[in-house]
Amino acid sequence: MCPHRLVLEHVTSRWGVLILIELLDRPHRFSELRRAVGRFGRGVSEKMLTQTLQTLERDGFVHRDAKPVIPPRVDYSLTALGREVAEQVRALALWTEARMGEVGEARERYDAAKRALGAATQDDPRA
């Protein structure tokens, strides 16, 4: 697989998108980020959040700041590169949200056409 496609997969993955958008507002601790991402539907597991954060950190999008205190404190924030990609992802998410009415209408037209085609096929004795 081409390296740029792999990075695109990381950025546009189910959790990658939500993490990047959430970190645009401010840095988050792990538990804060997990709760914030969970607001968008089914929650993310600790394992998946950890894996996604590590992947985004490796790609240079997320900075992990572990503070040597007790109890341990780790903050996650966007790098300059991460902020740039997160703004692009957020723009796509906002566009999608704004166009959902049109997408819904297109889906209804498509489904109606498929149903009509299916009914016509059932009525045709040659089928």
Residue positions per predicted region:
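Generic detection of well-ordered alpha-helical segments
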Residues: 13, 17, 54, 83, ...
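Canonical helix-turn-helix DNA-binding module
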Residues: 37-71
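Amphipathic alpha-helical dimerization/coiled-coil segments
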Residues: 87-127
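Residue-level recognition of specific faces of alpha-helices
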Residues: 22, 29, 52, 88-91
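Basic, amphipathic "hinge/linker" alpha-helix immediately C-terminal to the N-terminal HTH DNA-binding motif
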Residues: 68-91
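N-terminal helix-turn-helix DNA-binding core of bacterial DNA-binding proteins
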Residues: 2-48
